[in-house]
């Protein structure tokens, strides 16, 4: 079985994230969504809520699992025997950041590959931070959430 991990904070998990998972499932047999967090900075209940929300999206998709992790992505990948990290890229800045992360993952993960999915044009403006900002101002964000 070819497993990939998809890591992020997913605060919140958006339709852009869901699109990446869908596209990854076309290539991999299993996708583990890893919610990265720093226990010193993030309440565990916040992470548990995100896990529950994402699991609800994939309740009928047995090829997707969701869990939290608080160490290196390469270590998280190794625990799941993952062959790749999948990431979404919306901007040139995203690409530069993910390219550097890919190098670290390859070095630390014994050849762990990174597969980049470029955001579909209609989803390129969707980001968790933008959704949080809209929520802060009381706007309806349902169209940005799966």
Task: Give the positions of each predicted feature.
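Nucleotidyltransferase catalytic core that binds NTPs
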Residues: 1-146
């Amino acid at each position: 079985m070819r497993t990939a991990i998809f890591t992020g904070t997913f605060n919140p998990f958006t339709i852009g994230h869901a699109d990446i998972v869908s596209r990854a499932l076309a290539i991999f047999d299993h996708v583990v969504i890893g919610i990265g967090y720093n226990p010193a900075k993030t309440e565990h209940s916040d992470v548990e809520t995100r896990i529950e929300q994402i699991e609800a999206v994939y309740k009928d998709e047995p090829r997707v699992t969701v869990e939290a992790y608080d160490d290196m992505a390469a270590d998280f990948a190794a625990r799941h025997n993952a062959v790749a990290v999948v990431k979404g890229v919306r901007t040139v800045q995203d690409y530069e950041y993910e390219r550097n992360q890919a190098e670290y993952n390859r070095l630390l993960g014994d050849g762990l590959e990174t597969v980049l999915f470029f955001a579909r044009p209609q989803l390129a403006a969707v980001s968790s931070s933008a959704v949080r900002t809209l929520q802060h101002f009381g706007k309806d964000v349902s169209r940005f959430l799966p």
